[in-house]
């Protein structure tokens, strides 16, 4: 809506300054439309720069249980991890999402086509004294403060814009956490 107002006010400002013949009416109309145009541009710039009209919202979601990445012949439950980068605490985690799933799958693999979004997402793990493993996702995003701001500033799907997303997989102390290299060694040693 604000972009449409800017386009319309640009045309009105042009017409006010160049097409109105009366000097007094031209100054008043031209100044008013120019001030309205400047305020619309300022509002759009403030929204793009400092998210004017928006507020951060945090949602925490504890989702499904997870199941061991190891074969059923191994007595311990396994979580296989692979660190992304050398110093980051960001991981690709390999586990099963259902007990009947035949092969474990990697989760939290960054999307190389959406790098701006991928850099805002992190996944890690921790071992704690819990009974069941779980996945907890904390998501922070920009949302409009009211319907007025949403109507005024919505363009390019900027509502629910991601600030950060942190996912933590919590496993019991009885689980073994292995790197991908360690998991390969265990797989070679395990009888089929």
Regions found by a protein language model. Name each.
Residues 26-34:
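Membrane-interfacial entry segments at the cytosolic side of transmembrane helices
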Residues 55-56, 73, 82, 158-160, ...:
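Generic structural signal for short, flexible, solvent-exposed coil/loop and linker residues
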């Amino acid at each position: 809506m604000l972009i449409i107002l800017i386009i319309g006010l640009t045309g009105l400002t042009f017409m006010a300054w160049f097409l109105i013949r009366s000097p007094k009416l031209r100054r008043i109309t031209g100044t008013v439309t120019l001030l309205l145009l400047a305020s619309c541009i300022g509002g759009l710039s403030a929204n793009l720069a400092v998210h004017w009209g928006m507020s951060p919202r945090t949602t925490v979601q504890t989702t499904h249980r997870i199941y061991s990445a190891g074969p059923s012949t191994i007595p311990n439950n396994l979580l296989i991890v692979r660190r992304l980068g050398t110093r980051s605490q960001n991981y690709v985690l390999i586990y099963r999402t259902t007990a009947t799933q035949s092969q474990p799958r990697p989760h939290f693999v960054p999307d190389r086509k959406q790098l701006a979004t991928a850099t805002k997402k992190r996944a890690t793990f921790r071992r704690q004294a819990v009974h069941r493993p779980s996945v907890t996702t904390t998501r922070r995003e920009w949302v409009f403060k009211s319907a007025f701001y949403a109507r005024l500033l919505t363009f390019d799907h900027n509502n629910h814009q991601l600030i950060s997303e942190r996912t933590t997989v919590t496993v019991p102390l009885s689980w073994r956490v292995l790197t991908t290299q360690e998991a390969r060694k265990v797989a070679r040693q395990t009888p089929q």
